[in-house]
């Protein structure tokens, strides 16, 4: 069972060692798994999802892919095929600072997805992007190795794994 973001905020908001950060409420849940979390792998790119496919093709070990897509609203960075690939490879979900597509299909896949919005247009395929770099969006800076927890009430990030 996934930890609830509200419970994590209540338990850890005043603990300096957890470095708990709550994202600004701008992301929308699209995946069939509303509650998800795990260790973060970051990716920074713009309107190009080749690196998203590369990472979701590798074993995820219950992790969360955090994609800083620059907030682009001009194309989608993830759709049903990539979500299914991530699920098959053991990722718990993805946070996309950009758009997704195939929203009806995403809702049927046991994979967490939160993003800014939907867009029907696919992304470019140039293979550009940086992995394991600090990314900042929604009022929070996230690094690979942080822990992310998402549910219907929002997204929180901590410097370490949290328990209740």
UniProtKB/Swiss-Prot annotation:
Substrate binds at residues 79-82, 101. This is Putative 4-hydroxy-4-methyl-2-oxoglutarate aldolase. Homotrimer. It is an enzyme of class 4 (lyase). Catalyzes the aldol cleavage of 4-hydroxy-4-methyl-2-oxoglutarate (HMG) into 2 molecules of pyruvate. Also contains a secondary oxaloacetate (OAA) decarboxylase activity due to the common pyruvate enolate transition state formed following C-C bond cleavage in the retro-aldol and decarboxylation reactions. Pfam families: RraA-like. The keyword Lyase applies. It comes from the Bacteria. It comes from Halorhodospira halophila (strain DSM 244 / SL1). One of its GO terms (biological process) is regulation of RNA metabolic process. PANTHER family: 4-HYDROXY-4-METHYL-2-OXOGLUTARATE ALDOLASE 3-RELATED. SUPFAM superfamilies: RraA-like. One of its GO terms (molecular function) is metal ion binding. Its cofactor is a divalent metal cation. Divalent metal cation. A divalent metal cation binds at residue 102. Its EC number is 4.1.3.17, 4.1.1.112. Keywords: Lyase, Metal-binding. Belongs to the class II aldolase/RraA-like family. It catalyses: 4-hydroxy-4-methyl-2-oxoglutarate = 2 pyruvate; oxaloacetate + H(+) = pyruvate + CO2.
